């Protein structure tokens, strides 16, 4: 039987591409998404779609009961600006939502978790390109919630009281962009914002002196 993969946030532009690749490689996929930013139309028709929120433990439990072999956890609030406007929502979705995923993995003995973290956990590092070993020093609420989620997951993987092996991999992604990404969402990454400006014939607004740079 093909392995059953749960993709949270699978209706988003990253998650939908991950789902496509998994199905192409023969996996059975369930997409779990609240469609707050993702689009149902972008979900591969061969995937099982469940409308749900990672903050809803009851909905998550129902999905895990279908027999999940691994989880790719992409669902989350991804705007730094919104994290400052609504920090409690950022914490609830990014950190507590991830804890809910971890709890279900433990309850149902799901031994593989891949977590979509963020480069924001590094803050403003002095080294460019920034190596994975750079010290985490987030300077935004968003970065704090993603780093906290990482630590909960990786510490769980070291627990000696679990009766199964729990493997975790976190991906600290830098300004992801591509097909299916919204070009009208002002809270998306800088690439999408700039591309949207160009396609609409609008000026690209760069704040400060224009000399600032970052590791992409």
Predicted features and spans:
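N-terminal Rossmann-like NAD(P)+-binding domain of SDR-like oxidoreductases, especially those catalyzing
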Residues: 1-176
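Aromatic-acidic/polar surface patches that form glycan- and anion
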Residues: 15, 215-216
